[in-house]
Amino acid sequence: MSNGLIILIIVIAVALILAYVAAVVLRKRNETLLDSLEERKEKLYNLPVNDEVEAIKNMHLIGQSQVTFREWNQKWVDLSLNSFADIENNIFEAEGYNNSFRFLKAKHAIDSIESQINLVEEDIELIREALADLEKQEAKNSGRVLHALELFENLQVKVAEDTEKYGPAVQEIQKQLQNIESEFSQFVTLNSSGDPVEAADILDKTENHILALTHIVDKVPSIVTELREVLPDQLEDLESGYRKLVEAGYHFVETDIESRFSQLHSNITQNYENIAALELDNAQYENTQIQEEINALYDIFTREIAAQKVVEKLQENLPAYLKHTKENNQHLQSELDRLSKMYLLSDEEDEKVRDLQSELSALEAVVLATVEDSAENKQAYSLTQEALEATQERLKEIEDEQITLGERLERIEKDDDNARQKVNIYINKLHTIKRYMEKRNLPGIPKSFLSLFFTASDHTEALLTELEQLRVNIDNVNLLLENVTNDIHDLETETYQIVQYATLTEQLLQYSNRYRSFDQSIQEAFNKALDIFENQFDYESSFEVISQALEVVEPGVTSRFVTSYEKTRENIRF
């Protein structure tokens, strides 16, 4: 045997040994993997999913929750019956491949099994999460059902405890309670029979009906109490009060009070129908309307009661007030008669007094009629109050008119005295002004002064003549006095101006002598001013001529003389 053959045999033997060792190692590794996969499968299979499914199933889910549960339950059934069986078969098949040293197929099978287990693990996790969510949701739903039942039971107890306070509404309330009870029964039937969607709809409606009926039950007693007790009691008191007022002699402007009482009774009776039908908004509206009508009647009665008190006070006070205004009128008439002997009065005052007297007589008739009939009132006190208040207001106006007229009459004699005093003063002023002008030794008196003086004298003479009449016309006196006052004022002003211009002109003419000898313009102005002064007696123009000429050669000279004159001017001493 050659060395080459020996080496070949050794190589082959070594290769076989190595192959065997490798096969043993691979087989062992695959067995380990398969054991691990088997263990994972068993853990998944042993999870308490069945218990969780049964727990949810026993909750009697409704609506969408039940639909969702069925979907996840079916998924779990598929997993437990099919997926786990497939995994088990695949593991068995992989073990066969591994035991027969078909390692490639075994490896492929192991990878496939691992993928299957991963998918199953993910699906189980999703199923369990979904079941947990359903459990939470069902807890809420169960609480919802229990809450609805609790509300319903409380409502039943509340109504049963005191049916009387619900009045005619109790029958309809009990009927609706029975309807809600029927809805609960229908809900249970549908939920048990596997119609969750319809059952959920019924539960929604039932909850809404419970809430609506609860609101009604809470609202009805107050409406019933108002309609059954409050409003009838008010109406009874109102009718009783009305009868007493009528017996006491009260009358009313409104003639339909009895029919309004009847209508109120009818409205109260009819409103029970709204309550019986649970038309609570209508019932509340009708209660409000009834209350407003009762208030309106109450206002009518209180108006007349208040008016009666006012009428009594007016009947007590107006006669004295009327007497007072009549006395005022008599006094005015006496004053008119007295003054008419001394003064020419306009017909307006006399007519006014006569008109007031006639009106007072008419008002007296109204007052006396109400006072005499006070023991037997024949009309509503509010109408009597209106008439007496109008009378009182008119008496106040008449009194104001009497005061105004009295002041006018009183002013006649005051105006007469004032005119007599002032006419003497003005006569004295005329004499004083005349002497004042004479003392000035002027070359002549200006026409403006003479015109004002003679006008003032004539007006003063006219005023004296009017005041000396047997019956003085005081209106003419006041007019003449106003004219004389203005005349004296104008004359006094004119006098001061004439004297001022004359004095200043004389001073400036004398002052101009210092310039006349060498200034031709001053000489000419001097001659012109002197001519106007001595021949025309226009002292203001004369002053303007000489002052303008001097201002050219000596600016400010005029104002210096004017200022000096004003400081030393002699006033007219009246």
UniProtKB/Swiss-Prot annotation:
Belongs to the EzrA family. The keyword Transmembrane helix applies. Residues 104-141, 267-424, 456-524 form a coiled coil. Pfam families: EzrA (PF06160). HAMAP family: EzrA (MF_00728). It is found in: Cell membrane. The keyword Lipid metabolism does not apply. It is a single-pass membrane protein. Residues 1-7 are extracellular. Keywords: Cell cycle, Cell division, Cell membrane, Coiled coil, Membrane, Septation, Transmembrane, Transmembrane helix. Negative regulator of FtsZ ring formation; modulates the frequency and position of FtsZ ring formation. Inhibits FtsZ ring formation at polar sites. Interacts either with FtsZ or with one of its binding partners to promote depolymerization. This is Septation ring formation regulator EzrA. It comes from Streptococcus gordonii (strain Challis / ATCC 35105 / BCRC 15272 / CH1 / DL1 / V288). GO terms for biological process: division septum assembly; septin ring assembly. GO terms for cellular component: plasma membrane; septin ring. The lineage of its organism: Bacteria, Bacillati, Bacillota, Bacilli, Lactobacillales. Its main location: membrane. The chain crosses the membrane at residues 8-26. Residues 27-574 are cytoplasmic.
